[in-house]
Amino acid sequence: MFFRASFFLFGLVWITMAQLLAQDEKEKTTALKDLLSRIDLDELMKKDEPPLDFPETLDGFEYAFNEQGQLRHTKTGEPFVFNYKEDLHRWNQKRYEALGEIITKYVYERLEKDCNLKKEILPVDATEDEPKSFIYVSEDALSNPDKIMVLIQGSGVVRAGQWARRLIINEDLNSGTQIPFINRAKEEGYGVIVLNPNENSLEVEKVSDPAKKASPDASDEPAEKRERKEERENKKKKDFYEKYRNPQKEREMEHIPIRENGSPEEHTLYAWDYFISKSLAKNIFIVAHSYGGLSFVNLMINREAEVKSRVRAVAMTDSVHNVWHQEASKSIQDWLREHCCNWVSSPEPLDTLVDPMLNDCPRVSAGTEKHELTSWKSFQSIFKFFSNALKDHEDDSSSSPVTTRSSHRIKHEDF
């Protein structure tokens, strides 16, 4: 009997202790979850991070382009190294972006000094104080009576004269910039217009407004009590974060849209209205990479008659346009099928026909599986395509006043 009672008491104590331990573990788990929920992982990555102060010139980075147009370290001769500091991905990314801004300015210099292009400010009637964008044009872009070539890049950080920043930094200037296209076009008698579809806004530092208060309806608490509560919470957060990081405060920025150029589509339309369409050239040719293809289709939807009357051919490279989503009319789809060719990323040899995704623009292989390389890899084929398109148009114009649908059909066997 005594043994049973003792066993019962022991069991009761054991269960109670287990419950207490479980409760203690549960409380610890809850506390840990609460702790983790308040830790900003991005902030933790800033721990012991070096200052985000980077050089403003290529010389400062100790890099330069060699005779082959490759970016190399001036002391070691090595290519660019992204992981300059191990386990500091955010810092390395910021360093890469800082170098990218320098590259953008470098390409602008090459466009002006080597390609003899001049900058045209947008909007054309911009006031001194409003945000502005720009494009680059050759001296004869508006006066060339024969033909002009228009270059439109994809979306993202790339600016006028660039196809892909990654290629410029890691490969060479030929593959990553539009300079080879510009030089070849000028050699063949084209005027040139280089668009800048991603320069859509002016970035300025955001100025905080201390007078800006929360809406009176946001809370039933008295304003004074709410402010004291927020102050206490903010102090707690600050004290908490200080344990985990060496803070680097980044400036908070805001973007002021550029009038009538607030998106790639707007920019392309504006450039057409104020520059491309005002050119004296009878024949217009367009190279559009990635999102640039979508911007061109949008242009055609808005200026169909004008485009059809003057654009002889469009070379797209891995274009992301979609005639269904963009609601392009059947007449536009028919025109694209006759006057456009899309060089897409593919393992097939260059210029090999690729199954069409939609019944609008013929697709051929760019001879590479890398999206950003499609423009460079199809360089020779694009100029041949334009030459054939112009010859077909001139033959049709001289032989008959009536142009048949088949006369402009892309002859892939000619590539």
From Swiss-Prot:
Extent of Basic and acidic residues compositional bias: 204-215, 222-242
Subcellular localization(s) per the UniProt record: Nucleus; Cytoplasm
GO biological process terms, semicolon-separated: mRNA processing; regulatory ncRNA-mediated heterochromatin formation; RNA splicing
Keyword Secreted recorded: no
Record keywords: Cytoplasm, mRNA processing, mRNA splicing, Nucleus, Signal
Basic residues compositional bias, start-end: 406-415
Stretch forming the signal peptide: 1-18
List of catalytic residues: 290
Pfam families (alphabetical): Arb2
InterPro entries in the record: Arb2, Arb2_dom
GO cellular component, one term: nucleus
Record region (Disordered): 204-242, 392-415
Its job: May play role in the regulation of alternative splicing. May have hydrolase activity.
Family assignment from sequence similarity: Belongs to the ARB2A family.
Name the UniProt record assigns to this protein: Cotranscriptional regulator ARB2A homolog
